[in-house]
UniProtKB/Swiss-Prot annotation:
EC identifiers of the protein: 2.4.99.17
Function recorded in the entry: Transfers and isomerizes the ribose moiety from AdoMet to the 7-aminomethyl group of 7-deazaguanine (preQ1-tRNA) to give epoxyqueuosine (oQ-tRNA).
SUPFAM superfamilies tied to this protein: QueA-like
Organism listed in the record: Burkholderia ambifaria (strain ATCC BAA-244 / DSM 16087 / CCUG 44356 / LMG 19182 / AMMD)
Name of the coding gene: queA
UniProt family annotation: Belongs to the QueA family.
The name this protein goes by in its record: S-adenosylmethionine:tRNA ribosyltransferase-isomerase
InterPro entries reported in the protein's UniProt record: QueA, QueA_dom1, QueA_dom2, QueA_sf
GO molecular function: S-adenosylmethionine:tRNA ribosyltransferase-isomerase activity
Keywords: Cytoplasm, Queuosine biosynthesis, S-adenosyl-L-methionine, Transferase
Subcellular location: Cytoplasm
GO biological process: queuosine biosynthetic process; tRNA wobble guanine modification
GO cellular component assignments: cytoplasm
Pathway stated in the Swiss-Prot or TrEMBL entry: tRNA modification; tRNA-queuosine biosynthesis
Record text on subunit structure and interactions: Monomer.
Length: 355
């Protein structure tokens, strides 16, 4: 079996992108070409993406919108707290992480952003239920702060509020951006439309668990966080039409990939075709996984020892990803959320887990 150490690599800290580039499409794109063996690595700019895909292909985007989910506040006693909304569960309720010197008990009142009070409800490990006095999406948007990933060393500013959202974000609910989509601007989308590339969207609300480290050497023991997704019938129909004309299904980002593959795996297990799905998923994709829907993947460069690095290794092959990451480091690509992108093609046969 593969172990956690198989997905480690040394990354110079200066390659961790701290800010977005001035233009979304100014990022670089490392195309991994599987038509030759070993895979050929092609250095491109992201604006060249249309030349890498064909009319009739289908790009699948995640249209989730990042909430201003971070709050500072205090208890009635005056003790300071930090709150990160994990998920909106109802008009006036949400699950949240709370950092405090002492965990608040049920019924405790918390003052957030010196603007409104919430009441702590039942514990849903590792989260707390919070009850809001008004619709929580409204209060979150008005008074919250945009949460940036832990490896970005500055607090969110006005530029982040624009650039840490995709241009097509429409369904609020995430606490982290589907970052592969950050490279697309409206002119690029219009160019893809004009050349006959199809587009479709799904929704997966990215949770803070996306940054959760893997703490066990035997990765089979890792338990994934759960996220909610909505795969609409319109997307199911477009996938069928793409297959019929011989096109590729291209996931924009690992969140789109996880939603597509989760729905397809559930359909397989139920003995039925892919169908519209609204569900929770804790799908954990590692080498040996059999991909059912996605042919190609646009994705950023991921953290060492992360579940997302395991996912792309399962998709393109462990050695291919190792070679691509070595190349990216040598060529000074920018890493993580505000970094550069890769275009990967699915390995034809699943890679068996190591013995």
């Amino acid at each position: 079996m593969f172990t956690l150490s198989d997905f480690d690599f040394n990354l110079p800290p200066e390659l961790i992108a701290q800010t977005a580039l001035p233009e979304r499409t100014a990022s670089r794109l490392l195309e991994v070409d599987h038509t030759v063996e070993p895979a050929r690595l092609v250095d491109r700019n992201f604006v060249e993406l249309p030349s890498c895909i064909a009319p009739g292909d289908l790009l699948v985007f995640n249209d989730t919108r990042v909430l201003k989910a971070r709050f500072f506040g205090q208890k009635a006693s005056g003790g300071k707290i930090e709150v990160l909304i994990e998920r909106v569960t109802g008009t006036h309720t949400a699950l949240a992480q709370i950092r405090a010197s002492k965990s608040p008990g049920t019924g405790t009142t918390l003052r957030l952003a010196d603007a409104f009070d919430v009441t702590v409800g039942e514990r849903v490990e590792p989260f707390f239920t919070l009850h809001f006095p008004q619709p929580c999406l409204t209060l979150i948007e008005q008074h919250g702060r945009l949460p940036l990933p832990p490896y970005i060393e500055h607090d969110a500013d006005a530029n982040d509020e624009t650039r840490y959202q995709t241009v097509y974000a429409s369904n609020p609910g995430a606490v982290a951006a589907p970052t592969a989509g950050l490279h697309f601007d409206l002119p690029l989308l219009e160019q893809l439309d004009a050349m006959g590339v199809e587009r479709a969207t799904l929704t997966l609300h990215v949770g803070a668990g996306t940054f959760q480290p893997v703490r066990v050497e035997n990765i089979a023991e890792h338990r994934m966080h759960s996220e909610w997704y909505d795969l609409p019938q319109s997307l199911v129909d477009k996938i069928a039409a793409t297959r019929a004309r011989g096109g590729n299904v291209i996931a924009v980002g690992t969140t789109s990939m996880r939603a597509l593959e989760a729905a397809a795996r559930s359909a397989d297990e139920a003995g039925r075709p892919l169908a519209a799905t609204q569900a929770e998923t804790d799908i954990f994709i590692t080498p040996g996984y059999r991909f059912r829907v996605v042919d190609r993947l646009v994705t950023n460069f991921h953290l060492p020892k992360s579940t997302l690095l395991m996912l792309v290794s399962a998709f393109a092959g462990v050695e291919t990803i190792r070679a691509a990451y070595r190349h990216a480091i040598d060529e000074r690509y920018r890493f993580f959320s505000y970094g550069d992108a890769m275009l990967l093609t699915r390995r034809d046969t699943p890679e068996a887990p190591q013995a």
